């Protein structure tokens, strides 16, 4: 699906995310890097960017994770560094080198060429829609120049005040809805009940403009 979507709309529009990074007795730094390495070999030609982040130990998420494996936990500072160094090293061997970034993280890995991401990235929006005057007014002068062809990096852009402190996203409107994804990822905070989510999914009308 990732490759097909990239071929249809362009690799700059499809961002590869690998998060959150979780460690445990059966999930070591080396095993995580092995998985990322295999995926990077397969996906690097179909995207321009990899964004990753580390597990935030929200109580509800940790309860769900510990129900599967009590050893699951966030990486230590040393493990975060090892993961970042490993990802940067893998990137140098992939068929196509990617722009690397973290999402809402305090750790600074810029010496490894890893930036702080903005998932709603104004520089990418401006790159995709360079003639959109409304976007230009809102996002012109972005400092988040993660993509070629972005505007000047010397001025600040408007940050979304509704997001957490470390989030770099520009203002946007969420068009998604909670409780609508049937993948049921254990860490996901958007699903509170599998039965409720499956009920919504079953009732979804693909011809409707609404999710539910």
Language-model segments: which ranges?
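Local cysteine-cluster metal-coordination motifs and their immediate loop/turn environment
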Residues: 165-193
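Flexible loop/turn segments at secondary-structure boundaries
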Residues: 59, 108-110, 184, 195-196
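Long, low-complexity, charged/polar intrinsically disordered accessory regions
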Residues: 137-138, 142-143, 177, 193-195, ...
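A C-terminal junction/extension of Radical SAM enzymes
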Residues: 79-165
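Conserved AdoMet/S-adenosylmethionine-binding subsite of the radical SAM
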Residues: 1-86, 90
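A generic secondary-structure signal for well-formed alpha-helical elements
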Residues: 43, 47, 189-196
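Conserved Radical SAM active-site core
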Residues: 1-11, 192-212
């Amino acid at each position: 699906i990732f490759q097909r979507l990239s071929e249809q709309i362009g690799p700059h529009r499809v961002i590869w995310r690998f998060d959150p990074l979780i460690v445990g007795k059966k999930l070591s730094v080396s095993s995580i890097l092995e998985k990322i390495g295999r995926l990077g070999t397969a996906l690097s030609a179909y995207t321009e960017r990899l964004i990753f982040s580390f597990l935030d130990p929200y109580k509800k998420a940790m309860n769900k994770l510990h129900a599967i494996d009590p050893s699951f936990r966030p990486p230590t500072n040393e493990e975060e560094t090892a993961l970042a160094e490993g990802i940067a090293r893998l990137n140098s061997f992939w068929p196509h080198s990617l722009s690397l970034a973290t999402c809402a993280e305090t750790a600074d890995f810029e010496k490894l060429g890893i930036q702080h991401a903005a998932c709603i990235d104004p520089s990418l929006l401006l790159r995709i829609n360079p003639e959109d005057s409304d976007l230009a007014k809102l996002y012109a002068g972005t400092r988040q120049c993660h993509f070629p062809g972005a505007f000047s990096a010397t001025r600040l852009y408007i940050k979304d005040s509704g997001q957490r402190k470390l989030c770099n996203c520009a203002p946007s409107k969420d068009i998604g809805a909670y409780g609508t994804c049937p993948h049921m990822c254990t860490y996901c905070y958007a699903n509170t009940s599998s039965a409720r989510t499956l009920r919504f999914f079953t009732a979804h009308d693909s011809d409707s403009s609404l999710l539910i």
